[in-house]
């Protein structure tokens, strides 16, 4: 196969500013044997290894909006933060939705049914997808509640719709599985890495800088160094509406939700940006 498509992809993406979907549509004739999703994965994988892609743009990372129980101003806070730091890429570290109605834990008496909750979640997500047409995301434990409940009665993943389709996410939103590595930073939801030291503990075990969500109460960055390198662990906080019934369980918790997001500059530098009072 000719490598001309690589030069064409770089030109379309960097020089003409085309979206991923537009780039892949233009390159479709170069990959007659691949379907659109496979083409996008191939092109994205190549582009993200290019020096031009890696050249300096910070990454905005958010997690845990738990739609439809997200804070009403959270997407606009993300928009302002991305603009302020000139973010060139956006990532979500899971729990896009809450799935309160289908939890194995008891639902609140006032809870909506599963379909009504899903419909509202899709409406809320459309705000995020309009503001950020292209996002790389991983799945969180709340996103996977559907699969776990199905598995509990012997229904495997082959019988289920993909989460991407269930949530009606656009082509520009790409699921990267449970975790992935980009530019020597590991991005994951953070299951089993809770508490205020969860992120740095994961970074020390993984031996590389890590970004996680999951633990709502401990947004922030910690660093660890030895004689060879420095790594960070960042918990990017959450975007939940603590007044929503889905979070009634935390009414008396000592540590309240830390609303905010992360900005990753490189594999040795990151900051946590708390959501300011103007958005609360």
Residue map of PLM features:
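Short, amphipathic alpha-helical "recognition" segments used to contact nucleic acids or chromatin
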Residues: 2-18
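Short, basic interhelical loop/turn and adjoining N-cap
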Residues: 21, 27-45
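Short, basic alpha-helical nucleic acid-contact segments in DNA-binding proteins
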Residues: 45-53
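Beta-strand-turn-beta hairpins that frame and shape the catalytic cleft
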Residues: 53-60, 180-186
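Core catalytic region of metal-dependent phosphoesterases/phosphodiesterases
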Residues: 57, 62, 67-170
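Acidic carboxylate-rich catalytic motifs and surrounding loops in phosphoryl-/glycosyl-chemistry enzymes
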Residues: 137-142, 176, 273-277
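Short acidic low-complexity segments
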Residues: 164-182
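Conserved beta-sheet core of the metallophosphoesterase superfamily
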Residues: 184-277
């Amino acid at each position: 196969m000719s490598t001309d498509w690589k030069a064409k992809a770089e030109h379309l993406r960097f020089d003409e500013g085309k979206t991923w979907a537009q780039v892949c549509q233009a390159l479709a004739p170069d990959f007659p044997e691949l379907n659109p999703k496979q083409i996008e994965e191939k092109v994205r994988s190549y582009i993200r290894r290019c020096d031009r892609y890696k050249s300096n743009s910070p990454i905005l990372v958010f997690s845990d909006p738990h739609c439809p129980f997200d804070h009403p101003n959270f997407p606009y806070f993300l928009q302002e933060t991305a603009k302020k730091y000139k973010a060139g890429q956006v990532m979500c570290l899971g729990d896009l939705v809450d799935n309160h109605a289908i939890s194995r834990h008891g639902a609140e008496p006032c809870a909506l049914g599963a379909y009504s909750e899903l419909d509202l979640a899709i409406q809320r997500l459309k705000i995020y997808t309009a503001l950020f047409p292209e996002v790389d995301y991983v799945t969180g434990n709340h996103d996977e509640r559907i699969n776990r409940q199905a598995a509990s009665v012997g229904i495997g993943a082959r019988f289920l719709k993909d989460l991407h389709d269930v949530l009606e996410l656009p082509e520009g939103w790409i699921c990267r599985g449970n975790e992935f590595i980009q530019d020597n930073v590991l991005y994951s939801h953070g299951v089993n890495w809770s508490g205020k030291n969860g992120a740095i503990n994961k970074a020390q075990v993984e031996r590389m800088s890590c970004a996680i969500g999951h633990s709502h109460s401990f947004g922030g960055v910690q660093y660890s160094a030895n004689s060879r390198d420095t790594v960070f662990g960042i918990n990017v906080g959450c975007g939940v509406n603590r007044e929503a019934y889905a979070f009634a369980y935390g009414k008396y918790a000592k540590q309240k939700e830390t609303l905010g997001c992360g900005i990753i500059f490189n594999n040795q530098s990151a900051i946590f940006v708390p959501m300011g009072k103007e958005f609360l």
